[in-house]
């Protein structure tokens, strides 16, 4: 019933265990974080977020691969983790402080659940009054037709390392003109930060691995 918050290894393992087969207590017993701290649960993070009331927690819903393959078991575990996270968020009254960014994987979960991970995640987030962004680079019109209001995209497909990319002809402005919320990630170089900061009043978020530098430019 707990949701663990962690960046899994390449094989989707946490402390060399498959998290969908173990409890939080078992995952914690198998090891700590690199700094010695206990492996955190979603509730642990939400407690901190709510204490200050100034931070928004984004949860990245991955497509869990098992032995390097996307499987029915893995897709169901991904969708169910998001659904359980939404239940915890609602129980803790954190709907305005937690949002999801969801894998763009378009494979149906299973024959008994003929929808995708992102469809299940969007429905779960919407049901509790939270938001979910879709990490799939495609025609902005697809977002509208699927009822997905928010695109979370890599800078590599738009403007990256000082160069205009606009993959498939889709630019920052095209997503904005479609009426979508747009957030971007991996704006790490100065030139890229400067480019996206020109849109700072229109973008939903600009994500970077160097937040102090970005905030310095922002201000």
Question: Predicted segment positions?
Answer:
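Metal-dependent phosphodiesterase/phospholipase catalytic core, i.e.
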Residues: 1-114, 156, 178
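Aromatic-lined carbohydrate-recognition surfaces of secreted/lumenal glycan-active proteins
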Residues: 94-135, 183-186
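Generic beta-sheet signal
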Residues: 6-7, 120, 185, 209
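N-terminal non-cleavable signal-anchor helices
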Residues: 4, 116-118, 173
